[in-house]
Amino acid sequence: CYARLKEYDTYNDEPLVLFDEKESNFNFTLVTATNRVVNTGDLYFTPVKGNDPNSVIMRLNTGEGSHLDFTYTLKPDDYMVQYQILGTGLNGVLAPSTNALDLLWEQDIRQQEKGRKFEDRYVTLNYKFMADDVEHLSESKSDSKQIPNRLKWIGYKDMFFSTVLISQEGFEATTLDSKAIPEGDVLKQFKTTT
């Protein structure tokens, strides 16, 4: 996983990278039909050629005629990556009670601007309820919140840029964590579980 904004640089003229594979984790937990718990981050997905030149399909083959596809689509001149999960022939592979996937999303928010203290005041974990206003965890200290209500989106924001996960159906039973890091290149560590 790697997200770089090509039109922008950090205060010291380095490429502006929102996150890379060392600073982020995006993982789903699956329960198999034999009650094994597996994490998608531990599995091997292979790229599959699709019809859309703006899309990448990563496929987890689970047996003859069955697979799990993660499709990433980035339209030209857009920053919004469309992400779709599609399972084919997974009856007998996943537990019959599977009706949703448990998500773990972690990201370190690195310092991008020259003034660490000033920038740190703007680094927040924001979230929006399906039919309500935007809320956020504390900007100044470590914070955690369990939210039973459905969320429309969750955003990890630094001073000027955000990484946002949006759901059409909403996220349920979400736990949000923000850990303040007092020194070094990382300002905060954000974590979301659903």
Task: Give the role of each language-model region.
Residues 1-194:
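Soluble non-transmembrane domains of integral membrane proteins
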